[in-house]
Amino acid sequence: MIEQTRDITTAAGEMETFICCPERGGPFPPVFLLMDAPGIREELRDMARRLGTVGYYVLLPNLYYRAGRDTMFGPNVLEEGSAERERMRVVRTKMTIPPIMDDLAAMLAFTDGRAR
């Protein structure tokens, strides 16, 4: 299995993206695995790996990249009233559908341009 982190160029900057796929064979159909509110974490990387092992080219983008590279939250991010939850809420509320659609268009362009 190939695992790598690549920057995908978007209209807003470089979007850090975890990518995995099988080492041999192909072509591999792309799968865009979008994070939920708590953001990128090992559980999502594991899901991407599982999809990669069965023949997909999986892209897991950090959709919070506009808030800073490697934007991550602590383990209590889902606990009501926690500081991490409030920090996540502030970042999340700045995300709207149009920029996310632009990010997806950039991901499509990236997958179209990759070696088959």
Would you name each region that the model predicts?
Residues 1-116:
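N-terminal cap/leader regions of alpha/beta-hydrolase-fold enzymes
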